[in-house]
Amino acid sequence: MATFVSNWSTKSVSESFIAPLQKRAEKDVPVGNDVPIIDLQQHHHLLVQQITKACQDFGLFQVINHGFPEELMLETMEVCKEFFALPAEEKEKFKPKGEAAKFELPLEQKAKLYVEGEQLSNEEFLYWKDTLAHGCHPLDQDLVNSWPEKPAKYREVVAKYSVEVRKLTMRMLDYICEGLGLKLGYFDNELSQIQMMLTNYYPPCPDPSSTLGSGGHYDGNLITLLQQDLPGLQQLIVKDATWIAVQPIPTAFVVNLGLTLKVITNEKFEGSIHRVVTDPTRDRVSIATLIGPDYSCTIEPAKELLNQDNPPLYKPYSYSEFADIYLSDKSDYDSGVKPYKINV
């Protein structure tokens, strides 16, 4: 039976967690002082302008003064930390019986715990984390009842958080629409139907130089909002082929654009290639809310953005077919969309 990384007490790293040399993080990664930090309370025109530029240049940015209740952010982080501090037998309830949980389609909406990185069965090494994942929209009672009963406030707090984070995410998507010249609400349909919350726990690691909390990747969905309170997140600056550290800001959200949004914008906007490194002394919890299409969707560049000078860079494809490739083919960051790329 798999052991929770969060319950390990060890002075060495098991061989199964040792990353190949070419996939390991560099020793000294500089803080990315150029990562955009956008104040959502500033003048609307400037706000849209800054978000548009951040989407074009980085595919990742942080937002402050966003109106999300700060107390709710703190409460949610606290109950998530409390969950991972529970005894192993309590967390066992969220592991499928018989075999380790793996990310596969359709993603299970009910709460499931992924341990020892085993969702990456096609990788040659495991990631130093445990992940609690569950759906958050719509919030019907059956779904909420699948969430952890302990900590006692988990369901109440996370339900409130899920509603508020969706409001903020849809607001971000409308700012993106404005920057692209798309009608407001363009994404307020099946393109944003699925909402998953992935809470990642990265325990202290005896040898951070040989392990990863998460390898370099695009998110496959539309957009992700990430709450973090400690360093660990790093982004690849593609044009320079260098990694930078994304410094946490208390009560800020990191906004990651996914591969699906990159395709819909016909590459007007970038996606974010990012990874997570481990720490020798501190444990880290991050809360990621991923919003993306229903699996029945067809994905293609928005027709409103296409013309003779800007032809489509991708042919239409099934989101479920893409997701199968995305989850199974790790040969390149954008392997999931390569079969649909049009050479123009």
Curated annotation (Swiss-Prot):
The keyword Iron applies. Fe cation binds at H217, D219, H274. Keywords: Dioxygenase, Iron, Metal-binding, Oxidoreductase, Vitamin C. GO terms for biological process: coumarin biosynthetic process; response to molecule of fungal origin. 2-oxoglutarate binds at R284. Its cofactor is Fe(2+); L-ascorbate. Residues 193-293 form the Fe2OG dioxygenase domain. Its EC number is 1.14.11.11. Pathway: Alkaloid biosynthesis; scopolamine biosynthesis. It is an enzyme of class 1 (oxidoreductase). Belongs to the iron/ascorbate-dependent oxidoreductase family. Monomer. This is Hyoscyamine 6-dioxygenase. It comes from Hyoscyamus niger.
